[in-house]
């Protein structure tokens, strides 16, 4: 369709519907809030004159219909990550569609494809972020400089392992448990070499795995009245926290058993 039409025909309506669903999926799988996904999709539908549009979003799925139930679509979103650059790009596209700056579905589809292709930060940036975050958290929790250095090394190792898991499709609880175990092992070895306590380094480095976003968004969903999505996110956060505890506890228990002393 060359221009935005007041009464798009059936083929155009289907195309608009597919575009809106793709935009919602992009938002949801990159860390946007549930209510924000619904709001953005409704704005796009109204701007493209897709009448009687209704959408219901969960943390892992989108259900939408348009017209008198003549069109309906379901999208499964099993994979969720955090890429706020893509979220911001889709939100900006939504505002431009509403203002008329993006006036055709062709341009909107092109812009959405560009937003979906925004890359993640380079590997060295993620490694540096893990190193800096672990170092700072170790100091915040009362560790000395030696503990901070051990935590920094563990942070690099953890992020390198997470990058490896991402490229080979390793996910779920196993990834979190194994990463927490790797962090604990690296901190114990590093602190033993440097002659300092391992507890501050372990706690500081484990903070980079803490599900803060999932927990915060779960609370926000509850505040918004979406109890189902809030419950799902809270359970997700609790499972991640439990996986972290299992991984760290296994290594510390094994170390204490082998050495005959408690890890401090």
Task: Annotate each language-model stretch with its function.
Residues 35, 107-121, 173-174, 199-204:
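Cytosolic regulatory modules rich in charged/polar residues
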Residues 114-115, 158-171, 216-229:
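C-terminal ends of transmembrane helices
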Residues 190-264:
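Generic detector of multi-pass transmembrane helix bundles and their immediately adjacent loops
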Residues 119-199, 211:
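Core alpha-helical transmembrane segments of integral membrane proteins
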Residues 79-147, 236-245:
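Alpha-helical transmembrane segments and their cytosolic membrane-interface
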Residues 1-102:
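Soluble N-terminal domains of membrane-associated systems
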Residues 1-16, 118, 245-264:
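N-terminal charge/polar-biased segments
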């Amino acid at each position: 369709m060359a221009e935005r039409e007041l009464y798009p025909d059936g083929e155009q309506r289907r195309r608009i519907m597919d575009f809106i669903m793709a935009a919602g999926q992009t938002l949801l799988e990159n860390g946007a809030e549930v209510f924000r996904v619904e709001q953005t999709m409704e704005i796009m539908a109204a701007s493209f004159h897709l009448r009687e549009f209704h959408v219901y979003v969960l943390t892992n799925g989108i259900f939408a219909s348009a017209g008198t139930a003549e069109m309906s679509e379901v999208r499964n979103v099993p994979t969720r990550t955090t890429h706020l650059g893509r979220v911001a790009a889709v939100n900006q596209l939504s505002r431009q569609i509403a203002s008329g700056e993006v006036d055709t579905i062709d341009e909107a589809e092109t812009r959405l494809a560009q937003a979906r292709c925004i890359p993640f930060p380079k590997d060295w940036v993620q490694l540096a972020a893990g190193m800096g975050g672990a170092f700072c958290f170790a100091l915040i929790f009362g560790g000395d400089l030696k503990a901070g250095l051990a935590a920094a090394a563990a942070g690099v190792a953890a992020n390198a392992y997470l990058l490896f898991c991402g490229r080979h499709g390793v996910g779920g609880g196993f990834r979190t448990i194994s990463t927490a175990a790797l962090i604990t092992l690296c901190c114990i070895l590093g602190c033993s070499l440097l002659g300092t306590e391992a507890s501050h380094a372990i706690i500081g480095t484990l903070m980079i795995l803490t599900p803060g976003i999932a927990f915060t968004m779960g609370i926000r969903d509850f505040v918004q009245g979406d109890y189902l999505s809030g419950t799902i996110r809270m359970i997700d956060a609790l499972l991640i926290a439990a996986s972290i505890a299992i991984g760290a506890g296994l290594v510390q228990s094994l170390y204490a058993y082998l050495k005959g002393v408690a890890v401090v």
